């Protein structure tokens, strides 16, 4: 189930987003022990001028000041320690493979509760 959703402005120097998504999936699988088939990673590019921080907009993804926005969705049975490890694994992987400074990432984790997830045609309980 883990979902990792990444948003950024377009990069001035093109990145191989498909390859980065594969690497993040592999790194997260290795860090969490979760099989790759259960991990979903997406990357949405924001339109130039559609991301403001302190009222300042940018056309391209800067090295600082407009962090990449990452939202993780995990089942609520993970411990606080596991969640912290997973967040760090995503930060390390994204920074390394996308060549983005780790201090220019904002990662938020939300927890999905048993009975509040619909997948593969049915409600999921754990």
Where are these regions (language model features)?
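Interaction-mediating elements
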Residues: 1-126
């Amino acid at each position: 189930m883990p979902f990792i959703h990444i948003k950024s402005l377009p990069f001035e120097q093109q990145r191989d987003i498909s390859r980065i998504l594969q690497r993040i999936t592999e790194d997260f699988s290795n860090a969490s022990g979760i099989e790759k088939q259960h991990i979903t990673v997406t990357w949405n590019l924001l339109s130039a001028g559609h991301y403001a921080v302190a009222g300042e907009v940018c056309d391209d993804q800067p090295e600082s000041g407009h962090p990449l926005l990452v939202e993780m969705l995990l089942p609520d049975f993970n411990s606080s320690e596991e969640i912290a490890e997973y967040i760090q694994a995503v930060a390390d992987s994204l920074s390394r493979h996308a060549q983005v400074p780790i201090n220019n990432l904002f990662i938020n984790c939300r927890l999905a509760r048993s009975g509040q997830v619909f997948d593969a045609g049915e409600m999921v309980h754990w």
